Amino acid sequence: MLNFKLLKTDGNARRGQLTLNHGVIETPIFMPVGTYGSVKAMSPLELNEIDAQIILGNTFHLWLRPGNDIIAKFGGLHEFMGWNKPILTDSGGFQVFSLGEMRKITEEGVHFSSPINGDKLFLSPEVSMQIQRVLNSDIVMQFDECTPYEIDGRPATTEEAAKSMRMSLRWAKRSMDEFNREENPNALFGIVQGGMFENLRDESLAGLEELNFHGVAIGGLSVGEPKEDMMRVLEHVGPRLPANKPHYLMGVGTPEDLVAGVASGIDMFDCVMPTRNARNGWLFTRFGDIKIKNARYKDDKKPLDESCSCYACRNFSRAYLHHLHRTGEILGARLNTIHNLHYYLDLMREMREAISEGRFQLFVSQFHADRARGS
């Protein structure tokens, strides 16, 4: 089940509401990444406390471990991981294509060796849909080939990007056919590919619109390309996505990327950056980023961000977080993760409010001024 209501627009920025089988999501929204059915360093209780509305699971990794047979015994991923709100699962395509020499791509699908034990495995649009049916994720992603930015150390050519994109379109049709054959009651999103070429992106989008997916994602960005190329493609594709469907920008990115994405009409984002950076002591705040390992914070009594209401900022100093990071305490990674995800989710809340009140451009100007000010 999917119902998307567009509540308000402000320029290309959109305020919406997405109804799924496990709940209602207010958009624009950020989705914390739970690769193995767990958002690293966070319990479902803590995710609820920071108002996470939807999380992302990884089809490829969950298929390898614990395996579909285990998750099937629980009736799906929600019951298995103790999370009762919506879940989006990616198709596994990006992970398979990241295996490099360990995989062989054919029209049928991808043959590869398991990175865990070397077993010979095969993933195709049909297999991906079957796995995601067992996971019972609220949003299922089509199986696609993520066009790399570079091939053999040089940017992909138009011909290479076109060949990859057109195979993804054929796989989109097979994904849709299998999704319907499985009688999956959830939502299926198509993925726009085409590399750095606007005309190929347009061709991909036109092909997906014929298939009438429940939502549309932009894939193949933040894969090593220069930031100006990413923004050029985003600003071209975002406003062209169908207005009556949710728009998802995959694997992006920094706070600045999220604001730019919303300005281009994006409704949904995911990225490992807030959780991964948290574990490495890189913290995002309203007034710029903090690298908590730096000696300047060893006796700093201030909270990370005086404007932040997260558990870490309400209770602990920068000096204490510096100490936890320096000593490798698990609590440090946990508090840092709580803060970074709270910051990302609060940023999305502020953008929703700004769009609703017709002041999004003013918000963008203030956001950049604050981030440039420094902490």
From Swiss-Prot:
EC number(s) given by UniProt: 2.4.2.29
Cofactor: how bound: Binds 1 zinc ion per subunit.
UniProt keyword annotation of tRNA processing present: yes
UniProt keywords, alphabetically: Glycosyltransferase, Metal-binding, Queuosine biosynthesis, Transferase, tRNA processing, Zinc
InterPro entries found in the cross-reference section: ArchSynthase1/Queuine_TRR, TGT, TGT-like_sf, tRNA_ribo_trans-like
Keyword Cytoplasm among record annotations: no
Protein name: Queuine tRNA-ribosyltransferase
Species for this entry: Janthinobacterium sp. (strain Marseille) (Minibacterium massiliensis)
Gene it is expressed from: tgt
